[in-house]
Amino acid sequence: MKIVQILIAVTLTLSFCGKVNAQGDDADNHYKGLFANRFDSLGQWSVHYQFTSVLQGHPAFNSKYSGKNSLRDTAEKALSVTATLFLGRKLWKGAAVFVNPEIAGGKGMSYALGLAGAANGETFRIGSPEPALYLARAFFEQNITIRKSKTLYRKEDQNQIADNLPSSRITITIGKFSLADFFDDNSYSHDPRSEFMNWSLMDNGAWDYPANTRGYTWGAVIELIEPSYCFRLSSVLVPKIANSQIFDLNIAKANGETAEFEKKFMINDHPGNLRFLAFTNFSSAPSYNTAISNMRHGDSSLVAVFSGQKAGVQYGGLKYGFGISFNQELKSYLGVFSRLGWNDGNTATWAFTEIDRTASLGIRVRPNIIKRPGDNLGLAVVVNGISNAHRTYLNSNGYGFLLGDGKLSNYGYEQIIEAFYKIKLISWLWITADYQFIINPGYNKDRGSVNVFSIRLHVEL
């Protein structure tokens, strides 16, 4: 039954994407378990589907000037669509393989340019809005028992096979995936399909996590998982060109490493998590100071490297940084979260977004008081900044792959407030109203403020 519903959903997605191109508790468990009961009685498979569409826009705002990478100061709107099929198959004890074909279409406002904290986490800086089919994930997972420990049942879910797993184990993942699948997994602010939409709220903005334009990479992750803590380490490919689909296969000189320690705890019988993240990226990314010096002598050739137009001329680029993520349940219906992030800000942003320092704080609420426990309310504030070298580069008529107003003589922290209300219409369908207020877009006090309004439709099967 469920496989039929998913096929129908995929068909509807293809139809919907065509339109995008033309525009430039018990009941839940019963429903989601139909496929497992009728098709997969042994629990060998996992099949899920998601569809997300975001309609977003902003009215005109004050701007003293604009550059080629500026957020448009006239009113605009944009529509994005993604659809993902999550396929998983159990292989042997503790092992499984997962494949996720995905379709993405539409675009972000101003093609996702002009904001360090871009307003729609479902969009990427891609030149064409036409729907495209691609392989998002394809990875192998092996769980290894490391000592006698309690066995825990893990329910079947997206990219997750129903299985009994030891509470103390090592998990090895190899293949294509998003590093955000494993790291910085804040319980209240991580998924732009169902939570906050802003880029700097879905992940730690100062973590320039290695990925292609759509957010995926190839590599390996190893996790030590214990009941009260976890340790993760990854090594993956980095792009050959900033924010591109092409990976650099010279892995001796171009690679990205991320490490994270996660501590789990209880406060007054309510769960919480604290995560410490560190990363290093090696690539052909040039330094801001080198580009600034060259531009003062009339050589602006490195701007094409920073803006993702061509590959770097030599290896040796190093970016490193740190992040802290915290989330704590206060009541069964209320939770708080926070993030802090910093990177050295000396070399070009190569994969995620042009943020060198970030701090965020927010809350999530299930409004039981109005007897709608399936709904969700979120409110958060995030402040983003860049290094002095990054600031000087942008003020010298430099451009990154996201930012560049032509100058930046009046620098200010980019400040974002986001609020959303998510309504559960039926067991598999949600609609969200979202508002973002953005001060100093792209760190520029001469532009803004910007009001962003969004409607999001989300399906999960």
What are these regions (language model features)?
Residues 114-130, 150-256, 260, 398-405:
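Surface-exposed coil loops of outer-membrane beta-barrel proteins
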Residues 53, 89-90, 101, 142-144, ...:
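Residue-level signature of outer-membrane beta-barrel architecture
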Residues 35-47, 59-60, 89, 93-97, ...:
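Short loop/turn motifs that connect adjacent beta-strands in outer-membrane beta-barrel proteins
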Residues 47, 51-57, 99-103, 172-176, ...:
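Transmembrane beta-barrel strands of outer-membrane/channel proteins
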Residues 57-80, 186-189, 446:
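Surface-exposed strand-loop-strand hairpins of Gram-negative outer-membrane beta-barrel proteins
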Residues 260-262, 277, 281-316, 337, ...:
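Outer membrane beta-barrel transmembrane domains
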Residues 45, 79-85, 134-140, 170, ...:
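Hydrophobic, lipid-facing positions within transmembrane beta-strands of outer-membrane proteins
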Residues 136-149, 379, 449-461:
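Outer-membrane beta-barrel "beta-signal"
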